[in-house]
Amino acid sequence: MTKIAMANFKSAMPIFKSHAYLKELEKTLKPQHFDRVFVFPDFFGLLPNSFLHFTLGVQNAYPRDCGAFTGEITSKHLEELKIHTLLIGHSERRTLLKESPSFLKEKFDFFKSKNFKIVYCIGEELTTREKGFKAVKEFLSEQLENIDLNYPNLVVAYEPIWAIGTKKSASLEDIYLTHGFLKQILNQKTPLLYGGSVNTQNAKEILGIDSVDGLLIGSASWELENFKTIISFL
């Protein structure tokens, strides 16, 4: 399976830096990168999606066409921008913004009906990991229960919460074992990404694991040169 690199800007990128980054990345890449490189700016960092060398996505959207949903972005907004890719289930939205499994299912089903590419994020907390691998398997299985695992536009990103933003990635052995388990659950055509303190020093090794189909990268992608280095490992 072709390896993938996804950059999640979160809410960290200044607006004009984000715009400049997208334009410079477009100049750097080639058409064959379009379905291998993805960038998820915040809402203010978005531009109309005329890019030909990478795919532009959003970090979040509300599961309605449009309407009285103060502060939200909906599918009509995304259609105007020609954006058809989004993240669902990121741990920061689950924990900080209290998005429940039922609401994540509602999001998934809505954007599935619109044929969006959905990057569905899962991952356990350290307390679960410390209980042993059986507990991890049960937890991750539950996170995947409510979505259609045969949806052809699905990408799954495994991001152990205890590794996100900590500068301490999961060990290669942990990634190997967890991805091996998840591959048994997922459709064989569904890409499975790893995220969690990925950087230019560990990205190549992680990508060398057969069951890792790509990376979802946070802060290490916020500088264009770092992201370009990681892309070169694909």
Swiss-Prot record:
It is found in: Cytoplasm. Its EC number is 5.3.1.1. It catalyses: D-glyceraldehyde 3-phosphate = dihydroxyacetone phosphate. GO terms for biological process: gluconeogenesis; glyceraldehyde-3-phosphate biosynthetic process; glycerol catabolic process; glycolytic process. Substrate binds at residues 8-10, 165, 197, 218-219. Keywords: Cytoplasm, Gluconeogenesis, Glycolysis, Isomerase. One of its GO terms (cellular component) is cytosol. PANTHER family: TRIOSEPHOSPHATE ISOMERASE (PTHR21139:SF42). Homodimer. Belongs to the triosephosphate isomerase family. This is Triosephosphate isomerase. The lineage of its organism: Bacteria, Pseudomonadati, Campylobacterota, Epsilonproteobacteria, Campylobacterales. The gene is tpiA.
